[in-house]
Amino acid sequence: MLTMSELAKAVVSKQNGNVSPKIKLEKDSVILFQGDSITDMFRKYDCNQCNTPEQMGMGYALFAASTLLSDYPDKQLKIYNRGVGGNKVYQLRDRWELDTLAIQPDVLSILIGVNDFWHILMGNYKGSLGIYERDLQDLLHYTKEKLPNVQLVLGEPFALRGGSAIDDAKWFPEFDGYRASLKKLADEF
């Protein structure tokens, strides 16, 4: 399993002539981006066709898909984005059958966790770091049970310090625990 930072290093490595052996793309591989608003980034929910800008949104999923489709045209990759703004891990699980398992991805990228923390701060959610880690671990075990050969890429949740939405005194260092938890799960899977 790769974290997003490792994926970025793999992309740079590939640009330098080295391809990461951790993610293997075959002809007709299906790649799925899953997560919250950072993944969603204004994608059109009514567009379910693979490889279209409308269903990719305007964020990292579009950038990654464009790069992969350009770099590997012979692979005829099928790339989807099913991020949903505001989602927490339990909400991913609620829609997992339709929005993940039905797609049968060969590579599954998940970026989730900001809302699991932020909604606690806002008083809208009674979660905790332990609930986040347990829910995500259970979801990953379930996914590997249903899709044993899926290659996982886990993105560390992040918050940009200094912006109007992030009060550093409220977010840090507690939010760093969510990142550490994700890293622990990435090492496990």
Regions found by a protein language model. Give the residues of each.
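N-terminal export leaders
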Residues: 1-3
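Serine-esterase "nucleophile elbow" of acetyl-processing enzymes
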Residues: 5-82, 97, 101-104
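Short, flexible loop segments at the rims of nucleotide/cofactor-binding pockets, characterized by
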Residues: 8-11, 84-89, 170-172
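Alpha-helical cap/lid subdomain in secreted, periplasmic
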Residues: 25, 58-59, 63-78, 91-189
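Residue-level detector of flexible, active-site-proximal loop/helix-junction positions
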Residues: 38, 86, 159
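Short beta->alpha connector loops of Rossmann-like oxidoreductase domains
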Residues: 41, 86, 116
